């Protein structure tokens, strides 16, 4: 599937990828699941899981592909951390 990656101001590139696609940086993991959306998992001091445009998964040089297993481990650990924090309140 060819996907056009855009930021809010400029064209970035057109990629030919198979969905789902998994990418990561030092504190973010991404699951690209459609032509324009991805799930972003933030690990670390302020863990979060959110929906965002796929340009987030391609905007910096230090972001690279990762395995589904790596993404799922980060997703489940982050979800557990978020739920544990809410339970403590």
What are these regions, as identified by a protein language model?
Residues 1-89:
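Structural boundary micro-motifs
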